[in-house]
């Protein structure tokens, strides 16, 4: 009887521990996707005159139907582009 009780307790502890690890991993994934969602993405179909000046991406960009567009260096894309 003692061995059975010990086995059940060990099994419950193992299940609870793996559930906690899954929750932590899910939270990390959620935070990571939130982080990447906030990074600027290059806009398409814009008139761009962006370039590097003093090691900063600067210039003007005009995107039809969009406001608050600006020159920026993208996260995945190398170079200087337009984000809105």
Swiss-Prot record:
Q: Which GO terms describe its cellular component?
A: extracellular region
Keywords from UniProt, A to Z, are: Disulfide bond, Neurotoxin, Secreted, Signal, Toxin
Post-translational modification, as annotated: Contains 5 disulfide bonds.
Q: Which GO terms describe its molecular function?
A: toxin activity
Which tissue types show expression of this protein? Answer: Expressed by the venom duct.
Per UniProt, subcellular location reads as: Secreted
The propeptide sits at: 20-44
Q: Would you indicate the residue range of the signal peptide?
A: 1-19
Q: What is known of its domains?
A: The cysteine framework is VIII (C-C-C-C-C-C-C-C-C-C).
Q: Which family does it belong to?
A: Belongs to the conotoxin S superfamily.
Q: What is this protein called?
A: Conotoxin Tx8.1
UniProt organism field: Conus textile
